[in-house]
Amino acid sequence: MPRRYYITTFGCQMNKADSERMAGILEAMGLELAAEPDEADVLLYNTCTIRDNAEQKLYSYLGRQAKRKHQDPNLTLIVAGCVAQQEGEQLLRRVPEVDLVMGPQYANRLGELLEQVWNGSQVVATEPLQIVEDITKPRRDSTVTAWVNVIYGCNERCTYCVVPGVRGQEQSRRPEAIRAEIEELAAQGYKEVTLLGQNIDAYGRDLPGITPEGRRQHTFTDLLYYIHDVAGIERIRFATSHPRYFTERLIRACAELPKVCKHFHIPFQSGDNEILKAMARGYTRERYLHIIETIRRYMPDAAISADAIVGFPGETEEQFQRTLDLVAAVGFDQLNTAAYSPRPNTPAATWENQVPEAIKEDRLQRLNHLVAKIAGDRSQRYLGREEVVLVEGVNPKDAQQVYGRTDGNRLTYLPGDIETLRGQLVRVRITEARAFSLSGVPLAASSLVC
């Protein structure tokens, strides 16, 4: 009977994409996917260290599986991703039953590392590594939409964030390799790609070449133009954008290119300039608002989402109010919110002016209340409208319904048969509008692109 594997993924879209690649490697080695973790011979945890609670959850899982390994020595335990990169050998001292600790840059080398483990070694792979172009096809979770990494790592030095230390410096993939991957996805029947990067609009800064006009030869804007005409791909999304690199040229391209969905995820983190400076974000409140104004000048109905942190060290009530004011001024369609969580080896974690937990929790609740109200109000504009929805799957709560997303990334439910509608762009009249999702009725199958 072949070995079976199970992957538990924490955190961001980058981790989800890495997990798909590692699943592809495991299946190429002859392993099969297990239905449950306790049925697996190889357990892989792809980890996130942005928040402390995800890290604590990991160690809880590892403690349980370490006990299982004492009963079954053939069980292979792997910790991959950002916690693995951050902890390295220390993780083995804490949980000696772990067989392999590997940073995110080693996702494409899982096979050779696993062979070392099966030959009797306990392996730690966290040294800096140049990116390796995908050599094994990922086992993708969807047959309709796909992640495509375009840039790895991060050169920013935000004072609260561990990402540069665990994912390394920016490394952009060559445009030709990116297009080739997208062409292969189109040939397999995929309809939508999401281009991924920690700061995706910083793409190309590390690639050589200057144009006759004196600008960099490779920019994210140029990449969008380069891949846009791949036949069969109907929609192009991207995440995550950094305000520092979000230019008007990029905004114009998004407005001009019909396949590029009019949804933009641009974290702002705080609405106060002093806090932004302490965070080392590299932009001001005014700069952020100018970006949003420019997007809406070119694309009035564009959907905007973002990330925000409350309770950053030193944040006063007045500074928090500026965050609330910015949220109200922008009118976000969705906002990922979090209370500041001190992370190891970051400057902000050592500062003495930490905000008490009770105040952070109060501010988070107040912000979430405002976000839900604004999202609910903005959602009403969809009522009665026709939207084109790319159907992805079955509503897990109602087998008579399918779900998909609009151009603006609104989750939308509609009646229908998944075997008929999966991967189809369906014109839908919206009949219900909730804060973060819609419901509607199909009018006709559509071959329109977004």
UniProtKB/Swiss-Prot annotation:
Q: What is its main location?
A: cytoplasm
Give EC number(s), comma-separated.
2.8.4.3
- Cofactor stoichiometry and binding remark: Binds 2 [4Fe-4S] clusters. One cluster is coordinated with 3 cysteines and an exchangeable S-adenosyl-L-methionine.
Entry-linked SUPFAM superfamilies: Radical SAM enzymes
Reactions that this protein is recorded to catalyse: N(6)-dimethylallyladenosine(37) in tRNA + (sulfur carrier)-SH + AH2 + 2 S-adenosyl-L-methionine = 2-methylsulfanyl-N(6)-dimethylallyladenosine(37) in tRNA + (sulfur carrier)-H + 5'-deoxyadenosine + L-methionine + A + S-adenosyl-L-homocysteine + 2 H(+)
Q: What does this protein need as cofactor? A: [4Fe-4S] cluster
GO terms for MF: 4 iron, 4 sulfur cluster binding; metal ion binding; methylthiotransferase activity
Please list the residues that bind [4Fe-4S] cluster 2: C154, C158, C161
Q: Report residues binding [4Fe-4S] cluster 1.
A: C12, C48, C82
Domain (MTTase N-terminal): residue spans on this chain: 3-119
Please name the Pfam families in this protein's record: Radical_SAM, TRAM, UPF0004
Query: What is its quaternary makeup?
Result: Monomer.
Which HAMAP family does this chain map to? tRNA_metthiotr_MiaB
Q: What is this protein called?
A: tRNA-2-methylthio-N(6)-dimethylallyladenosine synthase
